A protein has these predicted regions:
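Short acidic, S/G/P-rich loop/turn micro-motifs used as interaction or catalytic elements
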Residues: 23-26, 65-71, 98-100, 118
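Short beta-strand element of Class I
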Residues: 41
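Alpha4 helix (beta4-alpha4-beta5 surface) of REC/receiver domains from two-component response regulators
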Residues: 73, 93-114, 123
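Non-catalytic signal-transmission and effector/linker regions of two-component phosphorelay proteins
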Residues: 1-24, 31, 37, 48, ...
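Conserved phosphotransfer cores of two-component systems
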Residues: 55-57, 77-88, 106
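Short beta-strand/turn micro-motifs composed of small residues
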Residues: 19-21, 64, 93-95
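Acidic, metal-coordinating helix/loop segments flanking the phosphotransfer/catalytic sites
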Residues: 45-61, 68-69
Length: 132
C-alpha cells in the first residue's frame, strides 16, 4: 500500500481498534489498512464475537460493517453499556449507502461509504481519537 502524502503511516500507533465485519475480505482489508497506519486491530466476524472481545478489552475505536439491522442492534447494545465497559467508544459505520446523519441517529459518530478510501478511514479514526 503506497504512502499517502498527507497522512503519517504511524499516526494510529497504539490505537486499539475493534473491527466487526461479517465478510472475511472486508475484515482483512480493514485490518490491513488500519495496521499499516499503526493501529492495533482486533478483527471479529460477528456481534457475539465482538461483544466477547469488549468484555475483555476496551477498544479506542469501534468499526462496524454489518448488514443493516445487525449493526443497529449491536450499536444499541454497545451504547447501553456503562462508560467504563465501553459504552462511549467512538464508532464508525461502514456501508455501501452510508449516511452520516442516519449513522449518528443510531449511535455512531461517523460513517464511511464503500469502496473505502484507506487514507480517509485512517484520518477519520485519528480525528475520533483527538475528540476524546
Amino acid at each position: 500500500m503506497p504512502c499517502g502524502g498527507y497522512f503519517s503511516v504511524d499516526s494510529l500507533r497504539g490505537v486499539l481498534v475493534l473491527v466487526v465485519d461479517s465478510h472475511p475480505r472486508g475484515r482483512e482489508t480493514l485490518r490491513e489498512i488500519l495496521s499499516y497506519c499503526g493501529a492495533l486491530v482486533t478483527p471479529t466476524a460477528s456481534v457475539d464475537e465482538a461483544a466477547g472481545v469488549m468484555r475483555q478489552v476496551k477498544p479506542d475505536v469501534l468499526i462496524v460493517a454489518l448488514p443493516e439491522g445487525d449493526d443497529v442492534a449491536f450499536i444499541r447494545d454497545v451504547r447501553s453499556l456503562k462508560p467504563e465497559e465501553g459504552g462511549v467508544v467512538p464508532a464508525i459505520a461502514i456501508a455501501r449507502d452510508a449516511d452520516d446523519d442516519l449513522a449518528r441517529s443510531r449511535g455512531y459518530q461517523a460513517s464511511l461509504r464503500t469502496p473505502l478510501d484507506p487514507w480517509e478511514l485512517c484520518r477519520l479514526v485519528s480525528s475520533l481519537m483527538t475528540v476524546r
